[in-house]
Protein backbone atom coordinates (compact mmCIF):
# COMPACT_ATOMS: atom_id res chain seq x y z
CA UNK A 1 0.00 0.00 0.00
CA UNK A 2 1.20 3.50 -0.84
CA UNK A 3 -0.05 6.49 1.14
CA UNK A 4 1.07 10.02 0.25
CA UNK A 5 -0.16 13.55 0.79
CA UNK A 6 0.29 16.51 -1.51
CA UNK A 7 1.82 18.33 1.47
CA UNK A 8 4.70 15.85 1.67
CA UNK A 9 5.55 16.09 -2.04
CA UNK A 10 5.27 19.89 -2.24
CA UNK A 11 8.62 21.45 -3.17
CA UNK A 12 10.22 18.06 -3.93
CA UNK A 13 11.22 16.54 -7.30
CA UNK A 14 7.57 15.40 -7.64
CA UNK A 15 6.37 19.04 -7.64
CA UNK A 16 6.88 20.43 -11.16
CA UNK A 17 6.23 23.98 -12.39
CA UNK A 18 6.20 24.78 -16.11
CA UNK A 19 8.99 26.97 -17.47
CA UNK A 20 6.52 29.81 -18.13
CA UNK A 21 4.99 29.45 -14.65
CA UNK A 22 1.49 28.83 -16.05
CA UNK A 23 0.93 25.46 -14.37
CA UNK A 24 2.12 23.37 -11.46
CA UNK A 25 1.80 19.58 -11.26
CA UNK A 26 2.16 17.59 -8.05
CA UNK A 27 2.93 14.08 -9.24
CA UNK A 28 1.50 11.86 -6.58
CA UNK A 29 1.92 8.47 -8.29
CA UNK A 30 4.64 7.93 -10.91
CA UNK A 31 5.91 5.13 -13.12
CA UNK A 32 8.41 4.07 -10.48
CA UNK A 33 5.51 3.10 -8.23
CA UNK A 34 4.85 0.25 -10.71
CA UNK A 35 1.04 0.44 -10.80
CA UNK A 36 0.55 1.05 -14.54
CA UNK A 37 -0.56 4.70 -14.40
CA UNK A 38 0.48 8.04 -12.93
CA UNK A 39 -1.74 10.40 -10.94
CA UNK A 40 -1.21 14.15 -10.64
CA UNK A 41 -2.84 17.19 -9.09
CA UNK A 42 -2.36 20.04 -11.55
CA UNK A 43 -3.15 23.72 -11.07
CA UNK A 44 -3.30 26.09 -14.06
CA UNK A 45 -3.22 29.88 -13.67
CA UNK A 46 -6.22 32.02 -14.60
CA UNK A 47 -5.82 33.89 -17.88
CA UNK A 48 -3.05 31.64 -19.18
CA UNK A 49 -3.03 29.85 -22.55
CA UNK A 50 -1.62 26.31 -22.51
CA UNK A 51 -1.18 24.00 -25.51
CA UNK A 52 -0.58 20.30 -25.00
CA UNK A 53 -0.33 17.17 -27.13
CA UNK A 54 0.17 13.83 -25.44
CA UNK A 55 1.15 11.80 -28.50
CA UNK A 56 2.48 8.96 -26.33
CA UNK A 57 0.00 8.96 -23.44
CA UNK A 58 -3.73 8.79 -22.76
CA UNK A 59 -4.80 11.36 -20.16
CA UNK A 60 -8.01 11.56 -18.13
CA UNK A 61 -8.68 14.90 -16.41
CA UNK A 62 -11.29 15.70 -13.77
CA UNK A 63 -11.72 19.39 -12.97
CA UNK A 64 -12.18 19.90 -9.23
CA UNK A 65 -12.07 23.71 -9.04
CA UNK A 66 -12.20 26.58 -11.51
CA UNK A 67 -13.67 27.39 -14.90
CA UNK A 68 -12.32 27.74 -18.39
CA UNK A 69 -12.25 26.45 -21.93
CA UNK A 70 -10.87 23.29 -23.49
CA UNK A 71 -10.18 23.68 -27.20
CA UNK A 72 -9.79 20.52 -29.29
CA UNK A 73 -7.29 21.72 -31.90
CA UNK A 74 -7.72 18.62 -34.06
CA UNK A 75 -11.51 18.90 -34.39
CA UNK A 76 -12.08 22.65 -33.94
CA UNK A 77 -14.38 22.19 -30.93
CA UNK A 78 -14.61 24.32 -27.79
CA UNK A 79 -15.84 22.95 -24.46
CA UNK A 80 -16.78 25.01 -21.39
CA UNK A 81 -15.34 23.44 -18.25
CA UNK A 82 -16.36 23.80 -14.61
CA UNK A 83 -16.12 21.81 -11.40
CA UNK A 84 -17.08 18.20 -12.10
CA UNK A 85 -16.13 18.33 -15.80
CA UNK A 86 -14.06 15.42 -17.11
CA UNK A 87 -12.24 15.03 -20.40
CA UNK A 88 -10.41 12.03 -21.79
CA UNK A 89 -7.70 12.44 -24.41
CA UNK A 90 -8.04 8.91 -25.75
CA UNK A 91 -7.28 9.99 -29.34
CA UNK A 92 -4.06 11.84 -28.45
CA UNK A 93 -5.77 15.12 -29.38
CA UNK A 94 -3.81 18.34 -29.59
CA UNK A 95 -5.58 20.69 -27.20
CA UNK A 96 -5.46 24.06 -25.50
CA UNK A 97 -6.62 24.89 -21.97
CA UNK A 98 -7.62 28.51 -21.24
CA UNK A 99 -8.63 28.98 -17.58
CA UNK A 100 -10.97 31.87 -16.75
CA UNK A 101 -10.28 31.23 -13.06
CA UNK A 102 -7.51 29.13 -11.55
CA UNK A 103 -8.20 25.49 -12.39
CA UNK A 104 -7.30 22.58 -10.10
CA UNK A 105 -7.56 19.20 -11.76
CA UNK A 106 -6.77 15.57 -11.04
CA UNK A 107 -5.05 13.81 -13.94
CA UNK A 108 -4.32 10.17 -14.74
CA UNK A 109 -1.74 9.20 -17.39
CA UNK A 110 -1.29 5.86 -19.11
CA UNK A 111 1.41 4.81 -19.66
CA UNK A 112 2.61 6.42 -16.46
CA UNK A 113 5.03 9.32 -16.55
CA UNK A 114 8.29 9.00 -14.65
CA UNK A 115 8.35 12.56 -13.36
CA UNK A 116 11.31 13.57 -15.56
CA UNK A 117 9.28 14.45 -18.66
CA UNK A 118 9.32 17.99 -20.03
CA UNK A 119 6.93 19.21 -22.75
CA UNK A 120 8.78 19.68 -26.02
CA UNK A 121 8.17 22.53 -28.50
CA UNK A 122 4.95 20.78 -29.62
CA UNK A 123 3.64 20.28 -26.07
CA UNK A 124 4.45 16.54 -26.20
CA UNK A 125 5.87 14.42 -23.37
CA UNK A 126 8.41 11.88 -24.63
CA UNK A 127 7.73 8.26 -23.80
CA UNK A 128 10.21 7.26 -21.08
CA UNK A 129 10.21 3.60 -20.17
CA UNK A 130 10.29 2.65 -16.51
CA UNK A 131 12.74 -0.21 -15.83
CA UNK A 132 11.00 -3.40 -14.67
Curated annotation (Swiss-Prot):
Its EC number is 4.2.1.108. Pfam families: Ectoine_synth. It comes from the Bacteria. GO terms for biological process: ectoine biosynthetic process. Pathway: Amine and polyamine biosynthesis; ectoine biosynthesis; L-ectoine from L-aspartate 4-semialdehyde: step 3/3. It catalyses: (2S)-4-acetamido-2-aminobutanoate = L-ectoine + H2O. GO terms for molecular function: ectoine synthase activity. Keywords: Lyase. SUPFAM superfamilies: RmlC-like cupins (SSF51182). The keyword Lyase applies. The keyword Lyase applies. It is an enzyme of class 4 (lyase). Catalyzes the circularization of gamma-N-acetyl-alpha,gamma-diaminobutyric acid (ADABA) to ectoine (1,4,5,6-tetrahydro-2-methyl-4-pyrimidine carboxylic acid), which is an excellent osmoprotectant. Belongs to the ectoine synthase family. HAMAP family: Ectoine_synth. This is L-ectoine synthase. The gene is ectC.
Amino acid sequence: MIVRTTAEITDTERDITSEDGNWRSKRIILGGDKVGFSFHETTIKAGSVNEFHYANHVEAVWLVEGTGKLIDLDNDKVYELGPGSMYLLNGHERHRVEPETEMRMLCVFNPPVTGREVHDENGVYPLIEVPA
